[in-house]
């Protein structure tokens, strides 16, 4: 028996070494097989991946050995378990190894995954774009990370363009993760507009575009300026107190009212309890979706059936999402009785009743939720980052104000003169670049097999177009971590359009709300700087341009500012 134990231990050790050896051949290029322990970041990544891979699979094999050698022999002691299970064990390990390497060779190279966790523990959740850039140095612009499933990361602009434009139709799918299917109920085609796929997505996107064409131009400008004046009146009251204030709620109130007017025909006072409840639910959904509990539910869908309260963050995510759905459902029922002229929900009900399109109530509810959440959260977060950079760079704030006053004087800013304010545009672009409010982007999925970067990508493969990595790519933006609006100006001081600067995405899935967001950002930013100065007194805490865990978006750490009303334009 001692001999058999030694044989079994030798088999275990050999299988582990074989596993690691095979992983080095598959995953590592010739230049990265030798793991060198030095202080460079790329070498640390190679070391930590190698150690994680080796450790995780030793643990798995150890668990197998523990079960085979200690548990089952106690159940049936007379049977020669050692002989039987040594054969089963060897066959099983060989099967695992072969099936694993057959599976991973379907994808581009990447770091070896840990058991259960994949590569998730080694991706910085706050700054994933930095991790993507580090892995790009090792594996190239297209590589595989094992998250809830094998996911292709595209970390270079040309590769992203190839995937989303050249192969735009093939990569236009969305994730079918449990955290999404929970609300859409349709694993094959999704629902709403952000998570919809195939014909369902095309039909809804067409209707949104057709509806929004009525708003673009003067109507949109007037709507944004109306709610900007409401915001200015609120800030003027705050300025009188000369106290520190967190601008998140006033900004959220103004921007939310713009998109609410468009989608459901409603406005709210900033402190309205119903409105505040919806904001809390949106924040919960956006934040909890990136937690470990939701990750595990996506990996192991059966976990969603555990009693509520065991996975608290998953429960909070689910409850908040369904409360939002119910809120929109109540509004939809009201719209069926009392139609609101000119809003998107009424437009969709008209289509339902005319039988031109068969849109379900759930599709309308989810689409309004997509428009509301997407149209508010990212814009609010961008402006919050903007105030931080102005507080830390008062000379930039002063230069923007000078340009705004030169162009508009005491007139209301308008989009027609935007090109006459190149420095303001450059500052906004630099804020968007550094804020990178969607660092994880929204994952795509292949609905057809396609070739990207020379790799054949199987159908139903998730893809993350890491546009955030492009925004911090030193080959594109010199000193990418510095706040430098001048990078968006040419030698003549005119605004410089940079092809790689794509904060709203590209291809068929480009953000539908891009024009709304650009209008909001420019008009609100220009109006506030025309009439207000954001400042701090000596001794006030200086806000740090660092992210806090906010979920799918990247908000800054909470901060406060003082506001001075300049009186350059009447706001009543």
Swiss-Prot record:
InterPro entries: Cyt_P450 (IPR001128), Cyt_P450_CS (IPR017972), Cyt_P450_E_grp-I (IPR002401), Cyt_P450_sf (IPR036396), Cytochrome_P450_fam2 (IPR050182). Disruption phenotype: The daf-9 mutant is dauer-like in head shape, cuticle, and deirid ultrastructure, intermediate in amphid and inner labial neuron morphology, and nondauer or abnormal in the intestine. Also, the daf-9 mutant exhibits abnormal reproductive development, molting defects and increased adult longevity. One of its GO terms (molecular function) is iron ion binding. Keywords: Cholesterol metabolism, Heme, Iron, Lipid metabolism, Membrane, Metal-binding, Monooxygenase, Oxidoreductase, Steroid metabolism, Sterol metabolism, Transmembrane, Transmembrane helix. Expressed in the 2 embryonic head hypodermal cells XXXL/R. It is an enzyme of class 1 (oxidoreductase). GO terms for cellular component: cytoplasm; intracellular membrane-bounded organelle; membrane; neuronal cell body; perinuclear region of cytoplasm. It is a multi-pass membrane protein. Its main location: membrane. It holds the Pfam family p450. It catalyses: 5alpha-cholest-7-en-3-one + 3 reduced [NADPH--hemoprotein reductase] + 3 O2 = (25S)-Delta7-dafachronate + 3 oxidized [NADPH--hemoprotein reductase] + 4 H2O + 4 H(+); cholest-4-en-3-one + 3 reduced [NADPH--hemoprotein reductase] + 3 O2 = (25S)-3-oxocholest-4-en-26-oate + 3 oxidized [NADPH--hemoprotein reductase] + 4 H2O + 4 H(+). The keyword Transmembrane helix applies. One of its GO terms (biological process) is dauer larval development. Belongs to the cytochrome P450 family. This is 3-ketosteroid oxygenase. It comes from Caenorhabditis elegans. The gene is daf-9.
């Amino acid at each position: 028996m001692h001999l058999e134990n030694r044989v079994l231990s030798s088999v275990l050790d050999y299988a582990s070494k074989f596993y690691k050896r095979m992983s080095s051949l598959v995953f590592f290029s010739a230049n990265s097989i030798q793991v060198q322990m030095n202080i460079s970041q790329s070498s640390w990544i190679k070391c930590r991946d190698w150690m994680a891979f080796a450790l995780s699979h030793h643990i798995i094999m150890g668990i197998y050995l523990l079960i085979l050698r200690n548990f089952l022999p106690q159940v049936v002691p007379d049977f020669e378990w050692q002989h039987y299970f040594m054969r089963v064990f060897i066959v099983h390990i060989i099967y695992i190894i072969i099936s694993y390497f057959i599976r991973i060779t379907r994808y581009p190279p990447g770091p070896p995954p840990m058991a259960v966790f994949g590569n998730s523990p080694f991706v910085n959740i706050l700054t994933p774009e930095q991790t993507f850039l580090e892995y790009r140095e090792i594996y190239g612009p297209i590589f595989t990370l094992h998250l809830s499933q094998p996911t292709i990361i595209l970390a270079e602009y040309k590769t992203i363009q190839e995937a989303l434009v050249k192969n735009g139709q093939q990569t236009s799918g969305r994730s079918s993760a449990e955290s999404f299917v929970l609300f859409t109920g349709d694993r094959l085609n999704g629902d709403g507009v952000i998570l919809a796929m195939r014909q369902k997505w095309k039909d809804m996107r067409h209707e949104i575009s057709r509806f929004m064409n009525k708003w673009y131009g003067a109507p949109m400008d007037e709507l944004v300026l109306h709610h900007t004046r409401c915001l200015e009146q609120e800030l003027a009251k705050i300025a009188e107190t000369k106290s520190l204030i967190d601008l998140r709620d006033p900004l959220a109130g103004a921007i939310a009212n713009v998109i609410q007017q468009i989608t459901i025909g409603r406005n709210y006072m900033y402190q309205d309890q119903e409105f505040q409840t919806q904001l809390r639910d949106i924040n919960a959904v956006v934040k909890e979706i990136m937690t470990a509990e939701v990750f595990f539910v996506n990996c192991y869908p059966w976990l969603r059936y555990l009693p509520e309260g065991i996975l608290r963050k998953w429960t909070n995510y689910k409850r908040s999402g369904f409360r939002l759905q119910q809120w929109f459902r109540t509004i939809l029922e009201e719209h069926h009785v009392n139609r609101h002229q000119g809003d998107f929900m009424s437009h969709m009900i008209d289509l339902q009743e005319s039988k031109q399109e068969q849109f379900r109530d759930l599709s309308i509810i989810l689409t309004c939720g997509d428009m509301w959440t997407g149209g508010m959260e990212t814009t609010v977060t961008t402006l919050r980052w903007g105030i931080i950079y102005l507080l830390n760079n008062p000379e930039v704030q002063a230069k923007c104000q000078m340009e705004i006053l030169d162009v508009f004087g005491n007139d209301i800013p308008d989009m027609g003169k935007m090109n006459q304010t190149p420095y303001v545009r450059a500052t906004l672009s630099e804020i968007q670049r550094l804020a990178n409010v969607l660092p994880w982007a929204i994952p795509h999925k292949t609905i057809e097999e396609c070739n990207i970067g020379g790799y054949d990508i199987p159908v139903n493969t998730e893809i993350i177009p890491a546009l955030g990595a492009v925004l911090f790519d030193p080959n594109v933006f010199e000193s990418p971590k510095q706040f430098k609006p001048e990078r968006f100006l040419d030698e003549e001081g005119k605004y410089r359009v940079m092809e790689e600067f794509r904060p709203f995405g590209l291809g068929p899935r480009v953000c539908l709300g891009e024009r709304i967001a650009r209008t909001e950002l420019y008009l609100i930013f220009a109006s506030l700087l025309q009439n207000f100065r954001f400042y701090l007194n000596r001794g006030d805490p200086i806000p740090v341009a660092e992210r806090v865990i906010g979920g799918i978006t990247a908000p800054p750490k909470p901060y406060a500012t003082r506001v001075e009303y300049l009186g350059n334009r009447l706001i009543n």
